Amino acid sequence: FYNVDTIIRIGSCGAYNEDLSLLDTILVDNAYTEGNYAYELNEEDCHIMNSSSDINKVIEDTAKELNIAYVKGNTLCTDCFDYYVKDVNSLIARFPKDLNIIGAEMEAFALFYNAKLLGKKASCLLSVVDSHYKHQEISADERQTSLNSMIKLALESAVNL
């Protein structure tokens, strides 16, 4: 539609790993969902999608060049903010244990799935803005002004593609 072949999504996420701190950058390896996006779109029972490994390699190399720290891992793609979930611990207990989910966001699964269907490439960088384990969050103002490392990494990586 827009003749785009590669997308690096940037956004915010909640931390599901006690080792993550506010404003840490996550490079998403796989996005897991309990939702039915793939089935509704394409009648496929699919709940995990991987990002494009070649884009991730460029991002990793760029992070090293720029001395930007990141954590690579798997995320949960939710249909609602976990802040509003009745029992977030019950939600976390449902995750496949072998996935080692480290964060939660709301778009990566669909992005990766659409990229697969269309023969495109997609990756995702996230900044941690709240922590389930540490009961911390950054302010709305900080969400607008403090995500510079992630944004710089995405832009410089795009130049290096």
Descriptions of predicted regions:
Residues 58-66, 114, 153-161:
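Generic non-transmembrane alpha-helical segments
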Residues 88-121:
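A C-terminal functional module that forms or caps the active site or interfaces directly
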Residues 6-10, 27, 70-77, 102-106, ...:
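General beta-strand structural signal in soluble alpha/beta enzymes
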Residues 14, 76-82, 110, 129-131:
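Glycine-rich beta-alpha junction loops
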Residues 1-58:
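Metabolite-binding pocket within alpha/beta catalytic cores that recognizes anionic/polar moieties
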Residues 46-98:
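Active-site rim beta-loop-alpha module in soluble metabolic enzymes
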Residues 132-161:
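His/Asp/Glu-rich mid-to-C-terminal helical/loop segments that flank catalytic regions of hydrolases
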Residues 109-142:
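Zn-dependent metallopeptidase/amidohydrolase metal-coordination segment
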